[in-house]
């Protein structure tokens, strides 16, 4: 039997239910919170863990988890220091449109991430929640709805690998006799020991609304240790002046000069102050206006060289932010980890979906041609490290980005990601990546809760946005996702997708 669903389409009763009192429906009532940049609570797996289907006994835990006693002893000693979080995406005050309010604060009755206890950081609504009804008595009253099928008697359904990003909807203390252990509830209703999860609040970074008081061109300062310069008249020389903080926004005059082989931009407020181009992400209009601009339509402008995204309504810029595109920046997307250039239209939108560590997803409409499997990123990192070390031995001049990568190599870190490799490396899963908008097979705009290096290319080809920006862009683009829906494929009934222009 088929039911018509609002506002368009049909659903078959073989695939859904209208009985809202079913245990599974009641157990899964906590849905994605569309009012927040991160629609779920998130964390990262610090040690391989079973994904339990019911509350395990202590004996079952010992059989299922390697060196459990040693792990729990270590956790009890370090719990307070390792489970702390910084303020994140959901802690930034937003207006009704989802734009960050400069200097704004949430009402005092709303808890910030650094005020929450561990249960709340893992998705619980209250500090000390009871055991969910569907897990009472050591049983499970609902079916296993994960993609990993197991017999009904199974204690757990698959293990979750270290570094996996988890989306969470709850947490509670499970009790087995005198043994007490906290469990987090994943979106697919499997249980993961809280001692093996590091909660995370995502990046609080965000872009800005553009208007008469914030005209373009301007730039974000990307580099730590950035300085302003004075250009010496009649000499091929630029002398350093003052320190300029990272991620500060600097108005530009539109004038550039070359000194000693480096490009400098003149600041808009002080004509004698110049900044190095390599320290900046510049927001400027395109050299020529594309078709949607001339038609007065909404469109998205992405510069791979500058790592910036600008939303336009016709020829009027309305919002700008930093992004992270494919890590090889301007390479061939068929053979490198680069974002394709060209004109595209959004083809699907999803509130959240799982991705693997190469940003492939079941909702992507196809894989990228550069997808290489779990070992591809590791081999690429090794090749990059070898190239940089050889260049240093040969005395070759390195770009600022390569200098950063070489410093990471010498510290024993991944050249591209540095210490953030712990949250975004090899063959693992990133669950419920938020605010996904596909513009080509395997390529999407989406939120990234696993890093905070926006302005630096580091993805496998997708366009990474900070969660606040990702949500705002998702809500701004067409067509809108109908109320109560989790995603749409763009078609004639939904309206045309917003145009995305990706250029050098």
Language-model features, listed with the residues they occupy:
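Loop/turn positions that initiate beta-strands
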Residues: 1, 163-169, 245-249, 480, ...
């Amino acid at each position: 039997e088929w039911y018509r669903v609002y506002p368009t389409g049909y659903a078959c009763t073989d695939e859904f239910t209208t009985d809202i009192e079913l245990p599974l429906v009641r157990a899964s009532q906590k849905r994605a919170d569309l009012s927040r940049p991160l629609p779920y609570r998130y964390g990262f797996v610090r040690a391989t863990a079973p994904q339990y289907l019911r509350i395990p006994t202590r004996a079952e835990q010992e059989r299922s988890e390697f060196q459990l006693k040693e792990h729990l002893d270590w956790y009890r000693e370090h719990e307070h220091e390792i489970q702390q979080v910084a303020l994140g995406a959901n802690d930034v005050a937003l207006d009704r449109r989802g734009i960050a309010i400069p200097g704004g604060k949430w009402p005092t009755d709303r808890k910030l991430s650094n005020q929450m206890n561990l249960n709340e950081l893992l998705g619980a609504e209250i500090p000390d929640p009871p055991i969910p009804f569907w897990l009472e008595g050591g049983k499970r009253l609902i079916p296993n709805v994960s993609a990993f099928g197991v017999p009904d008697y199974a204690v757990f359904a698959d293990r979750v690998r270290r570094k996996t990003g988890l989306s969470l909807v709850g947490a509670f203390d499970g009790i087995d006799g005198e043994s007490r252990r906290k469990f987090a509830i994943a979106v697919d209703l499997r249980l993961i020991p809280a001692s093996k999860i590091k909660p995370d609040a995502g990046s609080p970074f965000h872009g800005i609304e553009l208007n008469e008081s914030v005209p373009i061109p301007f730039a974000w300062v990307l580099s730590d240790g950035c300085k302003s310069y004075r250009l010496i008249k009649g000499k091929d020389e630029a002398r350093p002046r003052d320190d300029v903080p990272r991620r500060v926004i600097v108005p530009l005059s539109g004038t550039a000069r070359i000194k000693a082989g480096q490009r400098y931009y003149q600041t808009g407020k002080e004509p004698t102050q110049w900044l190095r181009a390599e320290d900046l992400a510049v927001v400027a209009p395109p050299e020529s206006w594309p078709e949607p601009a001339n038609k007065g339509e909404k469109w998205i402008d992405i510069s791979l060289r500058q790592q910036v995204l600008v939303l336009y309504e016709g020829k009027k810029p309305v919002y700008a932010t930093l992004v992270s595109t494919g890590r090889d920046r301007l390479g061939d997307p068929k053979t490198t980890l680069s974002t394709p250039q060209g004109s595209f239209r959004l083809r699907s939108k999803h509130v959240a979906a799982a991705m693997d560590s190469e940003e492939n997803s079941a909702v992507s409409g196809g894989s990228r041609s550069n997808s290489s499997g779990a070992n591809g990123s590791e081999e690429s990192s090794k090749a990059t490290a070898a190239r940089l070390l050889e260049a240093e031995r040969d005395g070759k001049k390195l770009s600022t980005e390569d200098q950063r990568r070489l410093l990471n190599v010498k510290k024993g870190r991944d050249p591209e990601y540095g210490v953030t490799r712990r949250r975004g490396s090899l063959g693992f899963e990133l669950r419920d990546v938020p605010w996904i908008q596909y513009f080509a097979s395997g390529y999407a705009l989406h939120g990234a809760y696993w890093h905070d290096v926006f302005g630096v290319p580091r993805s496998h080809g997708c366009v990474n946005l900070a969660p606040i920006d990702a949500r705002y862009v998702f809500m701004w683009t067409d067509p809108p996702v109908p109320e109560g829906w989790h995603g749409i494929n763009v078609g004639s009934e939904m309206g045309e997708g917003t145009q995305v222009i990706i250029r050098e």
